[in-house]
Amino acid sequence: MKSILNDFLLMIQFFTRIPINKNLQCEKVNFRRGAFFLPVVASIIGGMEFLIYLGLKNFLPPNVIIVLLLLFTAMITGGLHMDGLADTCDGFFSLRDKERIIEIMKDSRMGAFGTIAMIINLLLKYQLLYSLVLKDCSIAIILAPVIGRISILFLCLSKRTAKKNGSGNIFIGNMSKPIIFLITIIALAMNTYFLELKITIISFTAVLIITYLFYLLCLNKINGLTGDTLGACNELGEITFLLILLMM
């Protein structure tokens, strides 16, 4: 029980800015087991956002609330996944060789492509969430972060790392397939509880397709995956899910 709590708190500490004033074991096995809690952490973040939405919806217009939710997400996650998207776009769109792309992705300075990608990402999320709220589908606020993290886990089934060292190497190729599939079943069951089965199947299939296509792009560009590409995959997964949800 103690090890389970350790791994759960480790995921909160690693993926959020929620203060965990506790010394935790952080070996590779802890991250491997802790991956089970990644969608749980996402649902906690989404749940907090949903509570903010419920608390403000009678006082502020939906568009203002969505902006505040995006700000809250950036603060609670430290912009971790959006930063990965920006770095990935800076590198991939530079049209350089693998080594130079990875150097660009490691650069803390944001380039033009990263800036454009982040702006488009935020605009898309804003418009999609706003439109879904108007359609009385505010539950998407909770579901989208969960699906995004599921896409990360599927990407981590690959053992192809683009760098010898990096934070992403903790997860890439070190995930348990049975755990990932169990998490997926639980996430799909949760989705089906709130959405029609048809919508769940179509949206999740679309996310898997986008995840696989992105994986092929990563192989083509840098012959593997990095922590930045995992973050980018999360953002792509969330956007894809929200798009399909709005279309349905």
Curated annotation (Swiss-Prot):
Keywords: Cell membrane, Cobalamin biosynthesis, Magnesium, Membrane, Transferase, Transmembrane, Transmembrane helix. It comes from the Bacteria. GO terms for cellular component: plasma membrane. InterPro entries: CobS (IPR003805). Its EC number is 2.7.8.26. GO terms for molecular function: adenosylcobinamide-GDP ribazoletransferase activity; cobalamin 5'-phosphate synthase activity. It is an enzyme of class 2 (transferase). It is found in: Cell membrane. It is a multi-pass membrane protein. Its cofactor is Mg(2+). Joins adenosylcobinamide-GDP and alpha-ribazole to generate adenosylcobalamin (Ado-cobalamin). Also synthesizes adenosylcobalamin 5'-phosphate from adenosylcobinamide-GDP and alpha-ribazole 5'-phosphate. This is Adenosylcobinamide-GDP ribazoletransferase. It comes from Clostridium botulinum (strain 657 / Type Ba4).
